[in-house]
């Protein structure tokens, strides 16, 4: 897992997984794997899967990296506490999955809750 700052301000965790290093064959397989982790978690709640690839390609001026085969986000929330109204601005969580010919790139922003952050790291590392 690599930690980086994207665009000089977004704390991001990313892992590139060669298709030869996993039994998962597609973006949908990776999303289903993560959804199973969310569904098994006592607090996490699945919200939606967003097909970013289809959305961006449907736009008149949409630009997609030609190396991408697919790109989706799985959206979910841990939300055990809501101490401040502003917390909604950093929720829910999202894990992005981009598929290329050779690999999957799985990424997510740092979570404000260290336990939630650790769960996401573990889920991605288990792929």
Language model regions located:
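Short, solvent-exposed coil/turn segments at beta-strand boundaries
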Residues: 22-23, 69, 100-101
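C-terminal partner/receptor-binding element of secreted or periplasmic proteins
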Residues: 111-127
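Ser/Thr-rich, low-complexity intrinsically disordered terminal regions
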Residues: 32-85
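Short, surface-exposed coil-to-beta transition loops
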Residues: 89-93
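Beta-strand/loop substructures that line and gate deep hydrophobic ligand-binding cavities in soluble
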Residues: 94-110
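Short, conserved charged micro-motifs
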Residues: 22-29, 84-85, 116-118
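Short, flexible, solvent-exposed loop/turn segments with mixed acidic/basic and small polar residues
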Residues: 5-10, 64-65, 94-99
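Terminal, regulation- and interaction-focused segments at domain boundaries
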Residues: 1-42, 51-52
């Amino acid at each position: 897992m690599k930690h980086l700052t994207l665009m000089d301000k977004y704390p991001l965790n990313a892992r590139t997984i060669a298709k030869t290093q996993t039994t998962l064959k597609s973006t949908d397989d990776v999303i289903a794997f993560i959804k199973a982790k969310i569904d098994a978690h006592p607090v996490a709640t699945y919200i939606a899967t967003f097909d970013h690839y289809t959305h961006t390609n449907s736009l008149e001026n949409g630009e997609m990296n030609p190396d991408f085969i697919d790109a989706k986000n799985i959206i979910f929330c841990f939300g055990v506490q809501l101490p401040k109204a502003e917390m909604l601005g950093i929720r829910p969580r999202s894990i992005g999955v981009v598929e290329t010919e050779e690999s999957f790139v799985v990424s997510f922003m740092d979570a404000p809750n260290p336990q939630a952050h650790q769960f996401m790291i573990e889920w991605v590392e288990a792929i």
